[in-house]
Curated annotation (Swiss-Prot):
Transmembrane segments: 15-35
Any matching Pfam family: PC-Esterase
Entry similarity comment: Belongs to the PC-esterase family. TBL subfamily.
Protein name, entry field: Protein trichome birefringence-like 3
Naturally occurring in which organism (per UniProt): Arabidopsis thaliana (Mouse-ear cress)
Length: 434
C-alpha cells in the first residue's frame, strides 16, 4: 500500500511521502552539519577551551626537544592563556592567598642558563638536591596574577630605566628580573656593567636598562662599602641620601626596599651631619625611631625630586627571615634547614617579621605627596620556609664546605632566597603593576 499526500498546488499532482521524508532528513542533516561547523569555529577562537582541550604530545616527542625550547613553548602558551585576565591592583589583594603545587611549572631560567646570578643565590649549582621549591605558585584568593612575560616586560621598559635600590634581598630581586628577560635578548644586544655599588644591565634593542644600586639603609651609612661586619660599629646618617641619590635621578621606575639591616637587635647609632668625626655626635636610637627618620629623609627626597608624571615609585615590604623553627611548630628543628614545603597556615606570622616596622613604612608613605605603590611581599613570603638558600650558598666568597653544611645551626642562610625561586614571584607582582 502506498502512502500519498494530496498536493495543494497546480494540477493536483501527488508526491510520495517517502520522497518528502527523504528530503526532510537530508535538510536536517545539512543543518546539523552547519551548526557543528559553527561550534567548532567558535571554540577555536576561545583560548581557554582550545588550550585546555589539547591532547598532550607523546612522551618521546617531548623528551627529544631541548629543555630550553620546551620551557619557551610552555611560557608562550601560558602567556596566551594569561591574556584573558586583567589585573586590577585596586581589586586584587596579592597578600591574601595560598601556595599551590604545580608539577608542570618550569622556571624561565636556571642558575646555569642565566650568567648574572651571584653564587650566593645559586642553590642548584651549589648542590641543592630538591627541586620542589620551584614548583609552588602563588594564588591570591580573589584574583589572578598574570604570569611573567619577558616580551611584555621589555616592551613596557622600552626606552626606560628600571632601578632597584636597597640591600642584598633587593639585589636578588634585580637579578631575578634580569634573568627573567635576558633570554629573549640576542647575545650581541645585551651587556652588564658592575661596580661596587652600581650595576647596570642594558638591552640595546629596547634602549632599556635594568639597574641596581646598593643602599642597605637607603639613607647613607658608614657600612655600605666596605661592609662593617660588627653591627655595634655601624652608623646611619639618617638625614641624608644626597651622595647616592644622584644615581637615582632620571629613572623611570624606582623600586626601593630596606629592612633587614635595621634588625640587628641593637639600638641604632644615628648621625646628623658629617661622618668626619667618626662616632662623635652619633646618638643611639630605638630601631623604629631611627627607621622612621631614615624613611622620612627618603620620602622628602622623593617628594622634592621625583616628577610623578615621568617616574613611578615602588616600595617593597620586608622580606621575612626564618631562623626560629619553633615559630612553625618545630622546636627541635634547625632554622629553615631541610624544610621542603611552604607553611599552610594562612595566619602564620613568624618572629622574623616586625609588624611595627611595617606600620612605620605605611605611616611614612601615607603622608607623602608623591604616590608610592607598595609591593606587599611579606605575607606570601612568610610561608616559604622551603625556599631559602639554607646551606646551599657561599660565605666569604667561598661555597660552604661539607663540614659547614653539616652544621646548619651556624651556617644555614635563612634570610636570602634561591634563584630561580621566590623573588620571581615578587617580580611577577611588580610587572602586573607596571
Amino acid at each position: 500500500m502506498s502512502f500519498l499526500i494530496p498536493n495543494r498546488g497546480v494540477g493536483g499532482t501527488k508526491i510520495p511521502l517517502s520522497i518528502i521524508v527523504l528530503v526532510l532528513c537530508g535538510f536536517m542533516f545539512f543543518i546539523l552539519l552547519y551548526t557543528e561547523r559553527i561550534s567548532l569555529l567558535s571554540s577555536s577562537s576561545s583560548s581557554s577551551s582550545s588550550f585546555f582541550k589539547l591532547k598532550s604530545c607523546p612522551r618521546k616527542d617531548v623528551s627529544s626537544k631541548p629543555k630550553e625550547k620546551i620551557r619557551k613553548e610552555r611560557s608562550e602558551i601560558l602567556e596566551v592563556l594569561d591574556d584573558r585576565f586583567e589585573f586590577d591592583p585596586e581589586e586584587c589583594n596579592v597578600a591574601a592567598g595560598k601556595w599551590v603545587y604545580n608539577s608542570s611549572i618550569e622556571p624561565l631560567y636556571t642558575d646555569r642558563s642565566c650568567p648574572y646570578i651571584d653564587r650566593q643565590f645559586s642553590c642548584m649549582k651549589n648542590g641543592q638536591p630538591e627541586t620542589d621549591y620551584l614548583r609552588w605558585e602563588w594564588q591570591p584568593d580573589d584574583c589572578t596574577i598574570p604570569r611573567f612575560s619577558p616580551k611584555l616586560a621589555m616592551n613596557k621598559l622600552r626606552g626606560k630605566r628600571l632601578l632597584f635600590v636597597g640591600d642584598s634581598l633587593q639585589r636578588s630581586q634585580w637579578e631575578s628580573f634580569v634573568c627573567l628577560v635576558e633570554s629573549i635578548i640576542p647575545e650581541g644586544e645585551k651587556s652588564m656593567k658592575r661596580s661596587q655599588k652600581y650595576f647596570v644591565f642594558k638591552a640595546k634593542e629596547y634602549n632599556a636598562t635594568i639597574e641596581f644600586y646598593w643602599a642597605p639603609y637607603i639613607v647613607e651609612s658608614n657600612t655600605d662599602i666596605p661592609v662593617i661586619s660588627d653591627p655595634k660599629k655601624r652608623i646611619v646618617k639618617v638625614d641624608s641620601v644626597k651622595d647616592r641619590a644622584k644615581f637615582w635621578e632620571g629613572a623611570d621606575i624606582l623600586v626601593f626596599n630596606t629592612y633587614v639591616w635595621w634588625m640587628s637587635g641593637l639600638r641604632m647609632k644615628a648621625l646628623w651631619g658629617s661622618f668626619g668625626n667618626g662616632e662623635s655626635g652619633a646618638e643611639a636610637l630605638d630601631t623604629q625611631v631611627a627607621y622612621r627618620l631614615g624613611l622620612k629623609t627618603w620620602a622628602n627626597w622623593v617628594d622634592s625630586t621625583v616628577d610623578p608624571n615621568k617616574t613611578r615609585v615602588f616600595f617593597t615590604t620586608m622580606s621575612p627571615t626564618h631562623t626560629r623553627s619553633a615559630d612553625w611548630g618545630k622546636p627541635n628543628g634547625t632554622k629553615c634547614f631541610n624544610e621542603t614545603k611552604p607553611i599552610k597556615d594562612k595566619k602564620f606570622w613568624g618572629t622574623g617579621s616586625n609588624k611595627q616596622m611595617m606600620k612605620v613604612v605605611s605611616s611614612v608613605i601615607k603622608h607623602m605627596t608623591t604616590h608610592v605603590t607598595v609591593i606587599n611581599i611579606t605575607q606570601l613570603s612568610e610561608y616559604r620556609i622551603d625556599a631559602h638558600t639554607s646551606v646551599y650558598t657561599e660565605t666569604g666568597g667561598k661555597i660552604l664546605t661539607a663540614e659547614q653544611r653539616a652544621d646548619p645551626m651556624h651556617h644555614a642562610d635563612c634570610i636570602h632566597w634561591c634563584l630561580p625561586g621566590l623573588p620571581d614571584t615578587w617580580n611577577r607582582i611588580l610587572l602586573a603593576h607596571l
